[in-house]
Structure formats: structure tokens, C-alpha cells
A protein has these predicted regions:
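Anionic group-transfer/hydrolysis microenvironments
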Residues: 17, 86, 141
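Predominantly a Rossmann-like dinucleotide-binding segment in NAD(P)-dependent oxidoreductases
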Residues: 104-109, 114-200
Length: 200
């Protein structure tokens, strides 16, 4: 939790959802005793946050379709970017991230939290100690039930119900559409992240 770190100041936040802004302001005030500048009057207001001199880095935790665009804009503004998964949705967007980094020299990091789970780190430690010998084959995938995330009753996130899209709330409002309209593993780094590190 960044709010627990003494070397982190949260100077600004941005969200188009006023309820999320209120929750974030409350947590920041409780942890830091300060109120951050607030942005979110429209979908592109995040660019005004990126223009602030007292912002060194941003954490991007928006619906997926915004991840690449916001990360590219952050790097072009000279701000380090930590972007939630998935950082991109197309091969072209992957190259947008690479090319922007190479052009700007600004770093970004995909916040693939699975890599830091205790069980994954334990296996990585065993790999580094050569417990398994030479690894010649890996298999991975997205391995948990998401029905409670992708559907709800439109009143309570992560619960009962079958609503999604405009009738849903939280992630079911936007995330379920990806499964409906895309034939893809929309979270490939959950599986690939750990084995990529182990194969290195």
C-alpha cells in the first residue's frame, strides 16, 4: 500500500467517478493528513494532472481501454507510470509503449501483482536454487472463477446477480464486455509474468 510508505506523497488524484474520488480522498487524508488536488471533470482531465510539477509518477488503475493511452501520455510528460494489467489490448498498443519509452527515456512498469504472490515467489526461489533442474516446458493461464466479478445485481459489487454493462456496477460495468466481444486471454500477464521470470 503506497499510503503506508513514508517516502510517498499523494499530491493529486484523478477519476471520473465522484464516489471513487471521495473514497480516495478519505483514505489519503487518513494516511497522510493531506488532501490531494482532484481531477476528473472529464475523460481527458488526467492530462492536467500530468502537467503538475509536483507529480513524479502515476499509478494507472482505470478500465483497460485507457491503460495504453494514459501510460503513453504519462511517459511523454516525463512521469514514471505504473499501469495495472493489462497494459495494452493489441499488439500495436504494445509497440506504442515500447516506442514511447525509447523516444522519451521515461520508464513504465506493468503492475502484474501475481509475480509478487508468496506462492509464486516461493517457486521462483526454488527455480533459482535449481531444485527442479533444467526447466524445458511451461504452461500457464488464467485460473480462477470470475463470475462474481463480471456479474452483479447492479447494487453491490462482487456479489449476486447477472447484471453487467450499464446495469452493472464496478468492474462488471466495463470488464464483462471484453469477454463478450473479444476472443482472447485478456489478462495474459497473470500466467506469463511468473513463468517469464522463471525462464529468465
Amino acid at each position: 500500500n503506497l499510503l503506508l510508505r513514508k517516502d510517498v506523497n499523494v499530491t493529486a488524484i484523478c477519476d471520473v467517478d465522484p464516489e471513487r474520488i471521495a473514497i480516495a480522498k478519505k483514505h489519503i487524508a487518513e494516511a497522510k493528513g493531506k488532501t490531494p488536488k482532484v481531477f476528473g471533470s472529464n475523460d481527458l482531465d488526467y492530462k492536467n494532472l500530468l502537467a503538475l510539477a509536483d507529480v513524479d509518477a502515476v499509478v494507472i488503475a482505470t478500465p483497460w481501454l485507457w491503460h495504453t493511452r494514459m501510460t503513453v501520455d504519462a511517459m511523454e510528460a516525463g512521469k514514471y507510470a505504473g499501469v495495472e494489467v493489462s497494459a495494452s489490448n493489441t499488439l500495436e498498443e504494445c509497440w506504442d509503449l515500447v516506442n514511447t519509452h525509447e523516444r522519451s527515456g521515461t520508464h513504465m512498469m506493468i503492475l502484474e501483482n501475481v509475480n509478487y504472490r508468496r506462492d509464486i515467489l516461493a517457486v521462483l526461489n526454488m527455480v533459482k536454487q535449481n531444485v527442479f533442474g533444467e526447466l524445458v516446458h511451461f504452461r500457464c493461464g488464467y485460473q480462477h472463477d470470475l463470475r462474481h466479478v463480471k456479474f452483479n445485481d447492479g447494487k453491490t459489487a462482487y456479489g449476486k446477480g447477472v447484471e453487467f454493462g450499464e446495469k452493472g456496477i464496478s468492474e462488471s460495468k466495463w470488464r464483462t464486455e471484453h469477454s463478450v466481444k473479444r476472443n482472447a486471454d485478456v489478462y495474459p500477464t497473470h500466467g506469463l509474468g511468473p513463468i517469464a521470470v522463471m525462464a529468465d
